[in-house]
Amino acid sequence: MSDIALSISMLSLVAVLGLWLGNWRVYGVGLGIGGVLFGGIIVGHFAGVSDLALDEQTLHFIQEFGLILFVYTIGIQVGPGFFSSLRSSGLKLNGFAALLVILGCVVAAGLHQLFDVPLPVILGVFSGAVTNTPSLGAGQQILAELGADPGSTGLMGMGYAVAYPFGICGILLTMWLVRLFFRIKIDEEADLFEQHAGKTKESLQTINIAVRNPNMHGLMLCEIPSLDESDVICSRLKRGEELMVPRSDSRIELGDLLHLVGERHALHKVLLVLGEEVETSLSTRGTDLRVERVVVTNEQVLGKKIRDLDIKQKYDVVISRLNRAGIELVPTSQTSLQFGDILNLVGRLDAIEAVTNVVGNVQQKLQQMQMLPVFIGIGLGVLLGSIPFYLPGFPAALKLGLAGGPLVVALILSRIGSIGKLYWFMPPSANLALREIGIVLFLAVVGFKSGAGFVDTLINGDGPAWMMYGMAITLIPLLVVGVLARLYGKMSYLTLCGLLAGSMTDPPALAFANGMHPTSGASALSYATVYPLVMFLRIISPQLLAILLWAGV
């Protein structure tokens, strides 16, 4: 059997064994994809005992390519929410998440200095303690750039594997301790979150307003205060018994009924100007108007602004809502269309069909993936990751590497959405498949390389001490941030649990938090808010640690 065939066969065995281990559950908590690492350690141990060696170049390529696939697809997935999570609504959550990452770095650096822990070991323990695999890859890359011994990869892998189990358990323990210390009642916390969420964030609302203000009589819609700010869409106008689709130059009269869509505060402003709210139905039933939902799939309209399509003027159709990645937006004339946008159209059936032909609405395209943008993104990411950044006071250049470069490029490209006929939308099923393949390949190689000396290190070497270091890196930041967020951040417990799970990029912990109150979305919302920024920080932090500690700073 050739070296390549042998390597692929062994890694397949590792993947099968590891995924099987990952499916085991103890009280609802399991290793998940992390089981592949331990499958690799088991196979690597017996391969070492049998003096079976695999081709190093093949293993290295598979490891790096798997890491690239994983971080790129993560970036594509979280990119649309990354930049919005940095705005004011997520500043507090992201601030606490960044504090947790910084505290972990401080604890790791302190352990390195106090106990003279080898740099590869403390970086591996740091990555395992926070259950973050891309962090491990970034650390291995920067050590190679700094000229560390090739054996450091194995040391990092062993440190990661030793610290990983408590990294998963430690966050669950922290959630339990915070709940016990503050005597928290889950149902009350869920109700508190729902009340707060109702005041601070809401989906789009609708209202029917009768025009009673004589000063508005004869004005065009675009001339009405508050309607010209693009915060509210008028999707229907009823005059007498006639229901019509209004245009920006449509003139209103006293007694007209307007059906408006927008956020609650914006609708209230329009109500104060126009007249009074009425309960009369402006349903399209029994009329020649229809309401349809269509999906943007036509490459020719991607990136174009709604005003450029001139849908109102040409087709007498109103876009009343726009749903992008699950978030409802008020579609303004300045809104650019992206692949996968869901549009709410109001108009006559033939006109809606004409607009549908313009925007696409080909459902099959949502299940297809353009491969060209994938490799363009990966190529650009690798190039970006190879560019050295020289910072004052640092003894070595900082690089994003194969873990950070593709991630940053993916975040940017997914935010842009499309360039010409190229779009970076990736069907969720395809994204998940590539992401899982990538992380399985990476963990399989890391585990296999670590397996030869893992058992000896754990039993006869410094394994127990490494485990204690990992416990400190896991628990200290979690407990500090958990208490601060509760006491000073006035954060609800379920939101706090999502914050802690997201800060550790730990899906099992999120599943545990969701299980406390299955009907509340508080934990999932805070997890998704901090996840993009934390993933970026987790990739950058081991590189900064490695450079600073390498120079003895």
UniProtKB/Swiss-Prot annotation:
The family this protein is said to belong to: Belongs to the AAE transporter (TC 2.A.81) family. YidE subfamily.
PROSITE patterns the record matches: RCK_C
Disulfide bonds: none
Name this polypeptide is given: Putative transport protein ASA_0825
PANTHER family: K(+)_H(+) ANTIPORTER SUBUNIT KHTT (PTHR30445), TRANSPORT PROTEIN YIDE-RELATED (PTHR30445:SF3)
GO molecular function, one term: monoatomic cation transmembrane transporter activity
Residue stretches spanning the membrane: 4-24, 29-49, 65-85, 95-115, 158-178, 371-391, 403-425, 439-459, 465-485, 493-513, 533-553
InterPro entries to which the protein is assigned, alphabetical: AAE_transporter, RCK_C, RCK_C_sf, Transpt_YidE_put, YidE_YbjL
One Gene Ontology term from the biological process aspect of the record: potassium ion transport
Keywords associated with the record: Cell membrane, Membrane, Repeat, Transmembrane, Transmembrane helix, Transport
Pfam families named among the record's database cross-references: Asp-Al_Ex (PF06826), TrkA_C (PF02080)
Upper taxonomic lineage: Bacteria, Pseudomonadati, Pseudomonadota, Gammaproteobacteria, Aeromonadales
Family annotation (SUPFAM superfamilies): TrkA C-terminal domain-like (SSF116726)
Topological type in the membrane: Multi-pass membrane protein
Domain RCK C-terminal: residue ranges: 191-276, 279-361
GO CC annotations on file: plasma membrane
Annotated organism of origin: Aeromonas salmonicida (strain A449)
Lineage: superkingdom: Bacteria
Subcellular location: Cell membrane
Chief location category: membrane
